[in-house]
Each structure stands twice: as C-alpha cells, then as structure tokens.
Amino acid sequence: MKRPSFSVLANARHAPEIVACFRETEQWLPVTLAYLGLRPIVYPYELQLRTGEVAIFRERTDLVIFWMVFARRHYPVRSSEQVIIDVGANIGLFTLFSARQAPRARILAVEPFPDTRSSLLNLIERNGLSGRVTVSDCAVAASSGTAVMDAAVGVPSQYRRIYAAATTTLNARHRGSPALLQTAEGVPVCAKTLAELLDTVNVATADLVKMNIHGSEYEVLMSAPAAALQRCGRIALQYHELPADLHLGKKELFEHLGRSGFRLVSDRDTQRGSGVALLILDRS
C-alpha cells in the first residue's frame, strides 16, 4: 500500500486546491486524503473551518461539494454582493461560503427536498446565519405548481432532481440503479418560476444567482423571459449534458442567455457530461 504522502505528490495537479483546503481548515490533511481517495473518513464527519464555521458531512458527496466550493472555488463570490440566491442549496455549503465571502449579503437558499432542507436549516442555525439566510422549500421550474423529486433510496442528496424523462440518465453513475427506475411517483414539492423566486427577495435585482439543479437549468432559464433574467447580475451555473436527441446543450443555453444581454466569462467543461459556467449581465 502506498504511503499517503507519496500518493499526494502523485496528485500534483491538485496542489493549488490542497493549499486552499489548508487555508480553510486545520483538518485539511484528512479531508484532502479522503477527497483524493487515499484514506477514507468516517461519516458523519464534523468539519471546523479556521474562520469558525462548522459543517457536517453525512456522505462522501458532501465532502466533494465542500472541495468544489471551498478549495476549487467553483462559484466565485464578490465581497460587495448584497443579494445572493442559491438555487439547489443542498445542505448549504455554498450558502455558508457566500455568507462569509459577502458579509453584507442577504441570501435566499432554495432547497425543495425535505430531508436535505432539514440539514440545510441545521447548518444555517448552527452557524448563526438565520438573520441573513432565508430558506425556500420550492423547486425552480418552467411553471409554478407542483413538481416531483427523486424518492429512490440510496440516491445521494446532491443528485436528487425534479422528475423529467429528459434527465432520467443524468449522473446515473452517482445516483445508482434505483434512481433510473424512478417514475412520476416521487416526493411532491411546490414549484416556482425564476421570476416568482426573484420576487421572493423583494428587490429589483439579485447580484448573484448560483444554480445547480441537475438538468432542470435548461427548462428554467430558457423559459424565463428576458425581463426576469435581467434581474440577475451574474449567473454561476452548473450545466449538464442532456440526451443527444433533444438537440439541447450548453451552446443553446448560452445563446439564449446572450440574447438577454449575458456575456460568457468562463466555461469549465469537465468533458464528462457537465461543467460550470459564469455569465455576467452587460448593463451597458
């Protein structure tokens, strides 16, 4: 068996992220080794940040999301931002990150799945953020009403999604075979359009909208009128690859947002069916 120190050196491409993890927490070594698959940690795992915040990882995917948000800085947050919307908040790791990075921001965390939302609320309360963070229990969709979410046992919380035939095979490796059998009989949740969600924060515009909703980003953003989209200053978007026969992908999505005045600033495509893009509204 390889010693962890030598195995870490073999992962030199992760060096900047490892340094970032070191800066975030005194527990950087066990977290790094677990992320790299070199030495597992036992879940639930409590993580204390150097800045005082606490997060609880209940499964490996929580650790991966922590790494994406805090070490890789998937979603950039400006300190000057006043209103941030976290669509697909999950257990709240980006909410926690953005609250620290933008200390004057009000945050709307959107998480419709009941069990996951309970973890989100616990994280918010434990870190003293109840005065700054509002939690919405509605999914964001093309139309308001009721939607249905994954109910299959064993699906990691980060991969639960609104039921739609077009997204059945998304993240199949992570979601497991039970999720592939999902029908429209899942967990019913309320649904709001993007415009209705923006009305929730009771301001003209949101400085940043982060969105990771596992394939639903296409219907949400492409159905939204320009007037609603233009209430978003920046969109940090995790996009997913849909089946080829739909003829709908990131190109069409970026073009649609471009027609509403958005400029693509960065696009990190994993070449494995997903990517993260940052788009900024050009108000000139």
Regions inferred by a protein language model and the residue ranges of each:
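Phosphate/nucleotide-binding beta-alpha loop and adjacent structural elements of enzyme active sites
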Residues: 1-284
